[in-house]
Amino acid sequence: MPKLILCRHGQSEWNAKNLFTGWADVKLSKQGIEEAQSAGKKIYDNQIEIDIAFTSLLTRALETTQYILAGSDQQWIPVYKSWRLNERHYGGLQGLNKDDARKKWGEDQVHQWRRSYDVRPPRESEEQREAYLKNRRYQHIDHRMMPYCESLKDTLERVVPFWTDHISQHLLDDKTVLVSAHGNSIRALIKYLEGLSEEDIVGYEIKTGAPLVYELTDDLVVKDKYYL
């Protein structure tokens, strides 16, 4: 039976500081490390054998993947990394304190940027974009595909092709797949997998460092889901 494990990275240093993160590359906090280690132990205790893992290019997800595989004694399995699993790009909000943003733009506007389906936040500056374009981890990507900012809809539109071309192919081979990613890239996968409405998915909360297991039929219809 195909099995998919979705796990949002553990708490990051910027999560702890209440900052918009997006594509900014930050490490796990002490709490985040403990969450990721706990996720690995839960997988180990439940005797789940992972065949392959997918993660993003951002350090907090990469670290979470490493801690999960170490904690479940499966560090040797193949791990594939893709920018398509990166967090939603928060554009000009990245690095700002969320409370300060509410004071500047108002509670309603910030809520709309964070929790609507197809509304984008302000674009990042040209200086910020130039820094991404020069970053080695993105040199292999067509720069025309690099976002200035993203809505959840935009995030889904880059995540789903990666699901179709890569992740789902291993599930169709009856494998157990780990996806260690981010709140919004996981939210996009859940919307697609469960067929949720735009209204339902924007309010869907994703816990940090908590493995969410999907048991699937042979044609990848959700049979059961549960947190470990």
From Swiss-Prot:
PROSITE patterns: PG_MUTASE. The lineage of its organism: Bacteria, Bacillati, Bacillota, Bacilli, Bacillales. One of its GO terms (biological process) is glycolytic process. Its EC number is 5.4.2.11. The active site is at 9 (tele-phosphohistidine intermediate), 87 (proton donor/acceptor). SMART domains: PGAM. PANTHER family: PHOSPHOGLYCERATE MUTASE. This is 2,3-bisphosphoglycerate-dependent phosphoglycerate mutase. Belongs to the phosphoglycerate mutase family. BPG-dependent PGAM subfamily. Pathway: Carbohydrate degradation; glycolysis; pyruvate from D-glyceraldehyde 3-phosphate: step 3/5. One of its GO terms (molecular function) is phosphoglycerate mutase activity. It catalyses: (2R)-2-phosphoglycerate = (2R)-3-phosphoglycerate. Catalyzes the interconversion of 2-phosphoglycerate and 3-phosphoglycerate. The record marks 182 as: Transition state stabilizer. The keyword Kinase does not apply. Pfam families: His_Phos_1. Keywords: Gluconeogenesis, Glycolysis, Isomerase. Substrate binds at residues 8-15, 21-22, 60, 87-90, 98, 114-115, 183-184.
